[in-house]
Amino acid sequence: MELCRSLALLGGSLGLMFCLIALSTDFWFEAVGPTHSAHSGLWPTGHGDIISGYIHVTQTFSIMAVLWALVSVSFLVLSCFPSLFPPGHGPLVSTTAAFAAAISMVVAMAVYTSERWDQPPHPQIQTFFSWSFYLGWVSAILLLCTGALSLGAHCGGPRPGYETL
């Protein structure tokens, strides 16, 4: 149980950190032309620009993923201290929150990927996904692993019973 909880805490912390970095950086998409290159993220800087709906969806679900991941990691930390939290409930709440974070991040990444993938290419400009985009996908995988490990910690943990009264 301790190994599962420790690994879940490590995976959740990394997933939360990667999710925050992906959300806050602007290297999701890169375009390289004959003389210039440009990159963009989820937070366009041009004033008065019309922001596409898929960007708003990606922003919303990414923020939800960060919040769920924060809840998951918080309950994992609290479950390490039995005097602060009743035994058995921390990993279960963490499992639910981690899976919710993973699903939110997968939705955000799938929407962004499908919309960018369908954009018509320009013959003189090479476009590709950049490192912030890939960090978002890695965070989704880490959050999914956190949910599975938290579930393992919950199932392998002590059950509250008559002896705890």
Swiss-Prot record:
Induction line: By CSF3/G-CSF. Up-regulated in CD4(+) T-cells from peripheral blood mononuclear cells of patients with visceral leishmaniasis.
GO biological process: CD4-positive, alpha-beta T cell activation; defense response to protozoan; granzyme-mediated programmed cell death signaling pathway; inflammatory response; killing of cells of another organism; natural killer cell degranulation; natural killer cell mediated cytotoxicity; natural killer cell mediated cytotoxicity directed against tumor cell target
Tissue: Expressed in activated T-cells, in kidney, liver, lung and pancreas. Not expressed in brain, heart, or skeletal muscle. Expressed at high levels in TCR gamma delta-expressing CTL clones, and in some TCR alpha beta-expressing CTL clones (both CD4+ and CD8+), but is not expressed in other TCR alpha beta-expressing CTL clones and in cell lines representing B-cells, monocytes, and myeloid cells.
Major localisation: membrane
GO cellular component, one term: cytolytic granule
Localization of this protein: Cell membrane; Cytolytic granule membrane
Family: Belongs to the PMP-22/EMP/MP20 family.
PANTHER family linked to this entry: EPITHELIAL MEMBRANE PROTEIN-RELATED, PROTEIN NKG7
Protein name: Protein NKG7
Gene source species: Homo sapiens
Name of the gene this protein is made from: NKG7
